Amino acid sequence: MNSKVFAVLLLLALSTCVLSEKYCPTPRNTSCKKMNIRNNCCRDSDCTSNAFCCAEPCGNFCHKASDKPGGRRVDPNASCQTGYVYW
């Protein structure tokens, strides 16, 4: 009996974790036609209000978390500098 209760509680806890997962929103643009990019952030800690630092074609921007996957969070270990980056 105790193992059944434990299994139900474990399943409930795991489903809560999965349902609470947050993502970067899907970017509006799929490509960047500029000769530079603008990074407003390089990691989540650069953002305010618990926003995520999300990679987009024209740079990194802070966005409110989305329930739907589609965007990509910036790798905090990647080389990055805030501001305009020219190539």
Curated annotation (Swiss-Prot):
Post-translational modification: Contains 5 disulfide bonds.
Superkingdom to which the source organism belongs: Eukaryota
Single biological process term from Gene Ontology: defense response to bacterium
Localization (cell): Secreted
Signal peptide positions (record): 1-20
Keywords in alphabetical order: Antibiotic, Antimicrobial, Disulfide bond, Secreted, Signal, Toxin
InterPro entries on file: Elafin-like_sf
Reported tissue expression: Expressed by the venom gland.
Disulphide bridges, residue numbers: 24-54, 32-58, 41-53, 42-80, 47-62
Record has Transport as a keyword: no
GO molecular function terms noted in the UniProt entry: toxin activity
Protein family according to the UniProt entry: Belongs to the venom protein 11 family. 01 (wap-1) subfamily.
Name of the protein: U14-lycotoxin-Ls1a
